[in-house]
């Protein structure tokens, strides 16, 4: 039994399955961006299979069977962790989504409502775009050309943009400071991706220092 399966088994034992009529709501959240992706229902078997396979599986109330998200589309939800709420009757399932989550092709099942994107969600989407550019033709974009030139050049650009930010601040030009800060953050994100890291790693370090 894997660690995830053992952890899920322990969670299952805390759920009063009789109280919830055999089904618990499972809220699915993107682990990186914290964006809520969808909601489904799990019975004991669906929860167990999720832990065993590492891919989120629900119980379909209409088809009356287990179904693994993405079993036909390939847009699976890779399990990161699961937690129970304080009443032990609702699951929060954190995942790494592979492709769009909604069957309509949108990122979440609420995208059709034109919900306002949070800043962190947009930043995560930018990181995904930058990650995709790593394997792109160097002539196809500035980002791809940066990756092709290697870590030394990317690091140099981060240094240059840092100086530009400092100069903009000392000049008192706030509009220029915003523009130069955007350039710095962009190049820093490229450098993090180049090193196999993300902004989440930086945020986690900040949280650690704040404790």
Curated annotation (Swiss-Prot):
It catalyses: 1-(5-phospho-beta-D-ribosyl)-ATP + H2O = 1-(5-phospho-beta-D-ribosyl)-5'-AMP + diphosphate + H(+); 1-(5-phospho-beta-D-ribosyl)-5'-AMP + H2O = 1-(5-phospho-beta-D-ribosyl)-5-[(5-phospho-beta-D-ribosylamino)methylideneamino]imidazole-4-carboxamide. Pathway: Amino-acid biosynthesis; L-histidine biosynthesis; L-histidine from 5-phospho-alpha-D-ribose 1-diphosphate: step 2/9; Amino-acid biosynthesis; L-histidine biosynthesis; L-histidine from 5-phospho-alpha-D-ribose 1-diphosphate: step 3/9. It is found in: Cytoplasm. GO terms for cellular component: cytoplasm. It is an enzyme of class 3 (hydrolase). Coiled coil: none annotated. Residues 1-122 are annotated as: Phosphoribosyl-AMP cyclohydrolase. InterPro entries: His_synth_HisIE, HisE, PRib-ATP_PPHydrolase-like, PRib_AMP_CycHydrolase_dom, PRib_AMP_CycHydrolase_sf. CDD domains: NTP-PPase_HisIE_like (cd11534). Residues 123-211 are annotated as: Phosphoribosyl-ATP pyrophosphohydrolase. GO terms for biological process: L-histidine biosynthetic process. Gene3D superfamilies: MazG-like (1.10.287.1080), Phosphoribosyl-AMP cyclohydrolase (3.10.20.810). Keywords: Amino-acid biosynthesis, ATP-binding, Cytoplasm, Histidine biosynthesis, Hydrolase, Multifunctional enzyme, Nucleotide-binding. Its EC number is 3.5.4.19, 3.6.1.31. Its main location: cytoplasm. It comes from the Bacteria. In the N-terminal section; belongs to the PRA-CH family. NCBIfam families: histidine_hisI, PRK00051.1, PRK02759.1. This is Histidine biosynthesis bifunctional protein HisIE. It comes from Vibrio parahaemolyticus serotype O3:K6 (strain RIMD 2210633). The gene is hisI.
